[in-house]
């Protein structure tokens, strides 16, 4: 699992927090950020440079004939797919944690209201 990330030397992909991708001249620059340890001000990161793949294609405009384009490297595409899977899983886990905490807070409120209602009923019975 995560063979492409491991081929980059990333031995613990589960420690990845996020990534950024930008284009500089004829290269794509991938920067991977890892989770911060307690007491650290900055997250550790690694940077990779991928040359853009050049292709010559037939132009839509008949007068130009052929034209050259550049696109993302296939290897980088595979790495990004793995990063997206990792980051999406982390976001889903965070969303689930948030939902569970929200449900727990709601349950606390419902139970507190029910206890107050029962105590009020009990007070009515003992007050007579």
UniProtKB/Swiss-Prot annotation:
UniProt similarity note: Belongs to the UPF0325 family.
Pfam families in UniProt: DUF3461
High-level lineage: Bacteria, Pseudomonadati, Pseudomonadota, Gammaproteobacteria, Enterobacterales
Disulfide bonds: none
Transmembrane segments: none
Domain of life per record: Bacteria
Protein name: UPF0325 protein NT01EI_0832
